[in-house]
């Protein structure tokens, strides 16, 4: 890689990581002292595999809605454009292990879901692009490898 770039993930050597993993990608402190903790929640191996858009889209809806049942510290869950994972951000919540637990509990909730929240043209910008079963399969696969989540580089 060349010079350091402004975007943290552009400075990550994607050939060195081993998905699945959850890593602290960065922190920001606001002018009033609030701290944002942004996690890279990587479901798929970069440049080798990716999530199909309907499944990813549904998983985003499900996680965004269901995670808020477990914490009031969630700021956002954002899908990565490369379709390999999500960014999950918390405010004033520095506990990595608890963040993992919130993610695990949320994905367990996904497995029990009977519908995708806000899967309609009024509440979603591409309501036709969803797959509940695909989202459940992604959640199950990620949960099955929970013992790997802390091992970003497969060491």
Swiss-Prot record:
Any Pfam family matching the protein: LuxS
Keyword Signal on entry: no
KW Iron (keyword) present: yes
Catalytic reaction(s) noted: S-(5-deoxy-D-ribos-5-yl)-L-homocysteine = (S)-4,5-dihydroxypentane-2,3-dione + L-homocysteine
Domain of life: Bacteria
Essential cofactor(s): Fe cation
Gene Ontology molecular function: any one: S-ribosylhomocysteine lyase activity
EC number: 4.4.1.21
Binding site for Fe cation: 57, 61, 124
Function as written in the Swiss-Prot or TrEMBL entry: Involved in the synthesis of autoinducer 2 (AI-2) which is secreted by bacteria and is used to communicate both the cell density and the metabolic potential of the environment. The regulation of gene expression in response to changes in cell density is called quorum sensing. Catalyzes the transformation of S-ribosylhomocysteine (RHC) to homocysteine (HC) and 4,5-dihydroxy-2,3-pentadione (DPD).
UniProt subunit comment: Homodimer.
Protein family: Belongs to the LuxS family.
Protein name: S-ribosylhomocysteine lyase
Provenance organism: Listeria monocytogenes serotype 4b (strain CLIP80459)
Taxonomy of the source species: Bacteria, Bacillati, Bacillota, Bacilli, Bacillales
Gene from which this protein is expressed: luxS
């Amino acid at each position: 890689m060349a010079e350091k770039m402004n975007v943290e993930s552009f400075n990550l050597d994607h050939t060195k990581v081993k998905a699945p993993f959850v890593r602290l990608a960065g922190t920001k402190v606001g002018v009033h002292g609030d701290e944002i903790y942004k996690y890279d929640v990587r479901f798929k191996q970069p440049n080798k595999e990716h999530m199909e858009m309907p499944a990813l889209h549904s998983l985003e809806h499900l996680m965004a809605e269901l995670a808020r049942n477990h914490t009031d510290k969630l700021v956002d869950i954002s899908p990565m454009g490369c379709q390999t994972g999500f960014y999950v951000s918390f405010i004033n919540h520095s506990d990595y292990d608890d963040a993992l637990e919130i993610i695990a509990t949320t994905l367990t909730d996904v497995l029990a879901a009977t519908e995708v929240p806000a899967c309609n043209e009024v509440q979603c910008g591409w309501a036709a692009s969803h797959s509940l079963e695909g989202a459940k399969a992604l959640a199950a696969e990620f949960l099955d490898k929970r013992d790997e989540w802390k091992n970003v580089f497969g060491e």
